[in-house]
A protein has these predicted regions:
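NAD(P)H dinucleotide-binding glycine-rich loop of Rossmann-like/cofactor-binding domains
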Residues: 104-182
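Nucleotide donor/acceptor-binding cores
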Residues: 15, 41, 176-177
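Cytochrome P450 core scaffold surrounding the K-helix E-X-X-R motif
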Residues: 55-61
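Residue-level marker of beta-strand positions
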Residues: 77-79, 97, 133, 178, ...
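Mid-domain Rossmann-like dinucleotide-binding core that forms the NAD(H)/NADP(H) cofactor-binding site
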Residues: 146-229
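Short amphipathic alpha-helix with an adjacent loop that forms part of the alpha/beta core around
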Residues: 230-235
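Glycine-rich beta-strand-centered segment in the early N-terminal region that forms part
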Residues: 33-50, 63-107, 140-148
């Protein structure tokens, strides 16, 4: 088993994390204990920034039904610096700057980390980011240049690839095809940006927030409408 080489200072096995203890309630920020050994395919990352996806809000509110994994850690998009690597890991090394993402990439699929909170197990997925540190599966990490802004890098964990994936992989938009985007948030803006890159036209954005529509035009939206607009189809 690969060690962190931190046994001389047990405090380094403790990190601050946001924990979902009960659905619909505020997250609990508290000390969480990391396991002292990295398992095959796992990577220890020092988290620098984390994004907050709408799906996490839904997860907190249990909009898809009862949460059978409580209590558990959260977050699936972020950036950080690799601290240690487990056995078998070859795609990343100590000191690498990385994006943490929910989609699988190349690399090893590791088991989920086993953390403890108040002496009891706290669950996690293959990647979590609402913590000071995270034990991540190798295939949820992508190395980025060290001079790239880690704050901006979080967008590559979900919003950017999701938006571009919708346009290029799912809808497969072609030159001159029209696009309508409902909701100009992080994903919507990147759908607009990707649509512009493939020369879609028109690119229509619909949102209840006028400021988002204004911002959307910088990303490629050609026509923006408030969702409460009457006779929208005629326009």
């Amino acid at each position: 088993k690969h060690k962190y080489n931190l046994q001389k200072n047990i405090k380094k096995f403790i990190m601050r994390s946001a924990i979902l203890v009960k659905s619909g309630r505020q997250l609990v920020v508290d000390n969480v204990e990391l396991p002292k050994n990295l398992r095959f395919g796992q990577v220890l990352v020092n988290i620098k920034y984390s994004g907050i996806c709408g799906s996490q809000i839904n997860e907190i509110d249990a909009t898809k039904g009862p949460d059978k994994y409580l209590p558990h850690l959260l977050g699936h998009e972020g950036s950080g610096i690799v601290e240690e690597t487990g056995e078998g890991v070859t795609r990343v090394k100590k000191g690498d700057h990385v994006v943490l993402h929910w989609r699988k990439s190349s690399g090893l699929e590791a088991e989920s980390a086993k953390y403890k909170w108040k002496g009891k197990k706290v669950n996690s997925g293959k990647v979590t980011t609402f913590s000071e540190k995270s034990i991540v599966s190798e295939n949820r990490l992508t190395v980025i240049p060290k001079n790239f802004d880690l704050r901006l890098a979080t967008l590559f964990g979900c919003a950017i690839p999701t938006g571009f994936g919708v346009v290029n992989n799912d809808a497969q938009i072609k030159i001159g095809q029209s696009v309508i985007i409902f909701g100009i948030g992080g994903v919507g803006l990147n759908i607009a940006q990707a649509s512009k890159m493939v020369s879609a036209n028109p690119i229509i954005g619909i949102d209840k927030n006028k400021k988002k529509l204004t911002l959307g035009k910088k990303f490629g939206i050609t026509h923006g409408f408030l969702s409460k607009t009457k006779n929208l189809k005629d326009k």
